C-alpha cells in the first residue's frame, strides 16, 4: 500500500479554513425549534473501554444541555447498525451521530437520513462516499505518524512489525498511511526492515497475537519494534512475546485504555496515544444540536471521504509513555492513580499533587 493515496486529500486540513456547516436541504423535515433536540447515537461496539467512555460522555453532554439521546449498539454487525438507524429515524430523531462499523456500508445510513431531512455526523470513524454533514474525530493520520516517530526515535534500526486494525474501518487505513509516511525514509535507507505488515480483523487482540507469533517464528524472535495501531492489538502482540522480550521490544498503542496504561507503567508496553474523549463527545453533541436547529457549525478542517471534502472538527492526540502518565490521564481524571499503578509496588508509585 502506498502511503500517499489517502494523505493527499487530507492535506486540505492543513489549510485550517473555516467551513460553515448546515444540515441537509429538503427532505420535508422541519428544523427543530427551541424544544429538546432528539439525538440518535448509533455505535458499532462497546467492547473496548474507550467506546464505553464515548457513550457515557455523549449521554452526559446531552443531559447537561437538555437534549434527548437514544443510543443503539450494533455489536459489529452492519445489517444491525443499518436497521437500528432506520429505527431511530422512524422514532423521529432530529440528528444522527454514527460511529460506523463499516465506513463504506454506512453510506446507506446517510442516504436514508437525508431522505428525511435528518443531518448525519460521522463520529470518530469516517463514513465513506456519502454526503456526510460533519465529521468529528481526532487527527487520525497524525496519530499514525506519532506512533511511528516515537518508534523511530527509540529504535532507529532493526526489524519492525506493523499491525493495523480492521480493513473495514477507514481509520485503520489512515493510521497505516501515517505510520508508513514516517517509516518509509528509514526503510529506504536500510535502517529498518518491515518483516510483517498485516491488518488485524475487527481489531481483535487474538489476530494481533497470531500476526506477532508468526513474525517471531519467521524471524527467530529477531524483532525490535511492533507498531500496533491500538491498545487492543498492542495487548495481543505483547501476549505473543516470549518473557525475555517483554519490555525489550518496543510496542506502540492507541486509546490509553486502563490495561494499556497499566502495561506502560509496568514496562510491558512502551507508549500509547491518549485521546481525551470528553472534548470529542461534547463537540459532537453540541454540533448535533446546531445542525438540528439549522444553525451554523464552524469546522476548521475538511477530510475527503471519497465523495466530498467533509467539514471536520479534529481533536489533538497526545503521546503517553511512562514519563507523562501523571500529567495526562491521571491529571485529567481519565484514570485513577491506584488503578493505573495497582500492579506496581506502592513504594514505587509517583506522588500525586
Name each region found by the language model.
Residues 1-8:
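Bacterial N-terminal signal peptides that target proteins for export
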Residues 8-9, 308:
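Residues embedded in well-ordered secondary-structure elements
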Residues 9-16:
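Bacterial N-terminal signal peptides
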Residues 19-353:
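A residue-level marker of the well-folded mature domains of exported/periplasmic proteins
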Amino acid at each position: 500500500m502506498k502511503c500517499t493515496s489517502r494523505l493527499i486529500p487530507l492535506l486540505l486540513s492543513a489549510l485550517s479554513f473555516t467551513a460553515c456547516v448546515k444540515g441537509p436541504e429538503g427532505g420535508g423535515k422541519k428544523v427543530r425549534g427551541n424544544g429538546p433536540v432528539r439525538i440518535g447515537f448509533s455505535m458499532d461496539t462497546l467492547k473496548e473501554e474507550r467506546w464505553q467512555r464515548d457513550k457515557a460522555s455523549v449521554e452526559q453532554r446531552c443531559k447537561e444541555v437538555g437534549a434527548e439521546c437514544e443510543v443503539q449498539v450494533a455489536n459489529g454487525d452492519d445489517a444491525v447498525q443499518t436497521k437500528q438507524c432506520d429505527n431511530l429515524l422512524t422514532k423521529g430523531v432530529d440528528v444522527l451521530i454514527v460511529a460506523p462499523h463499516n465506513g463504506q456500508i454506512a453510506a446507506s445510513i446517510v442516504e436514508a437520513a437525508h431522505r428525511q431531512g435528518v443531518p448525519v455526523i460521522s463520529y470518530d470513524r469516517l463514513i465513506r462516499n456519502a454526503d456526510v454533514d460533519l465529521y468529528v474525530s481526532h487527527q487520525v493520520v497524525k496519530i499514525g505518524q506519532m506512533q511511528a516517530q516515537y518508534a523511530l526515535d527509540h529504535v532507529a534500526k532493526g526489524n519492525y512489525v506493523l499491525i493495523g486494525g480492521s480493513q473495514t474501518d477507514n481509520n485503520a487505513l489512515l493510521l497505516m498511511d501515517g505510520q508508513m509516511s514516517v517509516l518509509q525514509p528509514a526503510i529506504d535507507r536500510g535502517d529498518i526492515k518491515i518483516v510483517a505488515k498485516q491488518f488485524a480483523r475487527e481489531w481483535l487482540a487474538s489476530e494481533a497475537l497470531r500476526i506477532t507469533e508468526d513474525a517471531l517464528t519467521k524471524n527467530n524472535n529477531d524483532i525490535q519494534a511492533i507498531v500496533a495501531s491500538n491498545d487492543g492489538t498492542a495487548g495481543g502482540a505483547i501476549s505473543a512475546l516470549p518473557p525475555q522480550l517483554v519490555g525489550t521490544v518496543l510496542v506502540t498503542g492507541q486509546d490509553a485504555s486502563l490495561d494499556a496504561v497499566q502495561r506502560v507503567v509496568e514496562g510491558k508496553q512502551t507508549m500509547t496515544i491518549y485521546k481525551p474523549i470528553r472534548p470529542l463527545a461534547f463537540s459532537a453533541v453540541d454540533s448535533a444540536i446546531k445542525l438540528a436547529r439549522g444553525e451554523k457549525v464552524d469546522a476548521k478542517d475538511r477530510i475527503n471521504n471519497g465523495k466530498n471534502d467533509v467539514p471536520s472538527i479534529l481533536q489533538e492526540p497526545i503521546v503517553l509513555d511512562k514519563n507523562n502518565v501523571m500529567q495526562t490521564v491521571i491529571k485529567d481524571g481519565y484514570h485513577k492513580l491506584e488503578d493505573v499503578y495497582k500492579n506496581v509496588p506502592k513504594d514505587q508509585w509517583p506522588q500525586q499533587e
